[in-house]
Amino acid sequence: MPDLLQLQVHDLEVEILTGIYSEETHLPQPLRISVTADIDIPERFAPDTPLSASKSYIDLKHAATDGLPKDVHFTLIEGVADHIADTLFISDSRVRRVEVRIIKLAIAERDESIGITLVRHRR
């Protein structure tokens, strides 16, 4: 099994047009998104290894925030997760696996975390 590097960003809060109920379809819904991307890596990271041998965390953050279309309504949050995964796969051929966790903040009570985790592998 090849070595991989897991890059992670957690608990990004965004507002996206999503939902199936009438009270959800007109206003952006608050979501908390976490992303993990597994990428191919060199055999070793020397002290002077350039960033190009890895991947910037900013790429993951962008895919889960500014990379999401603001004018598109996603019926399901699974569609939001797929959009994030697709963005990361398209942007870097070294990305092997993407895991996206989305929590719907509008329906959570107290300390609940209600949402989904989608895992996609490069095909």
Each predicted region: which residue ranges?
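N-terminal, polar/charged subdomain of small-to-medium soluble alpha/beta proteins
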Residues: 1-123
